[in-house]
Amino acid sequence: MERLSTLPEKEKKRVRLTVAYDGTNYHGWQIQNNGITIESELNRCLTDLLREPVEVIGASRTDSGVHALGNIAVFDTTSRMPAEKISYALNQRLPEDIRIQKSEQVPQDWHPRRCDSRKTYEYRIYRAQFPMPVKRLYSLFTYYELDVNRMQEAAAYLEGEHDFKSFCQTGAQVESTVRTIYSVEVEEQGENDLVIRVCGNGFLYNMVRIIAGTLLDIGQGKRDPMDIFTILEAKDRSAAGPTAPAHGLTLVKYEFL
């Protein structure tokens, strides 16, 4: 488990940030050697603001190109700046595609990955004859006809506790591939927009994008809704559909239970 800091207990406080970002220009959340990330920008700007080395820990390490309305990060600091004021000062330093929605002090032993939580992701699809430029960074474009009823039927079969190994990127190192999905909704918004909304207690690497790719296959008639059961039973990545592109995915909400 990652440690937040080695600062003396009496001198530090722990601060939780709610972070929104457009992931288009970033190599994901986690620090990488080959590009700028959300985590590296937060560390850089917090270190500059608080005049001490700061390293944040993120609740969800989103992939390159994925967006967020409410990811969570925490860090320790000895600064006397009130926790609730940090959001205002930090937003003055961050790039315009990253914004802190809230900053607050939390108990010193609070850690985002040790808490029971509920995450909600949305995968957005734009269906039309031609692409819409203003949606190109946040929705997957398709000109295929999609049978939404078939997608909704298949989505319901994913709900509950299952072994989602077939929906996990090959090579991912995890102790268990069992997860609980509270709900999977396929919702039409207007004539052209379609949203796949998935809520669960945790997700495997690329799991939501593989779910989206599989539901798209079903919507196009390439698979039957009942194939979900066969895919789950296979426990093999090759049994599921393709991994949908990252730019259609947004982490909408992170709730601690």
Model-predicted regions and their roles:
Residues 1-257:
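Structured-RNA-binding interfaces characteristic of tRNA pseudouridine synthases
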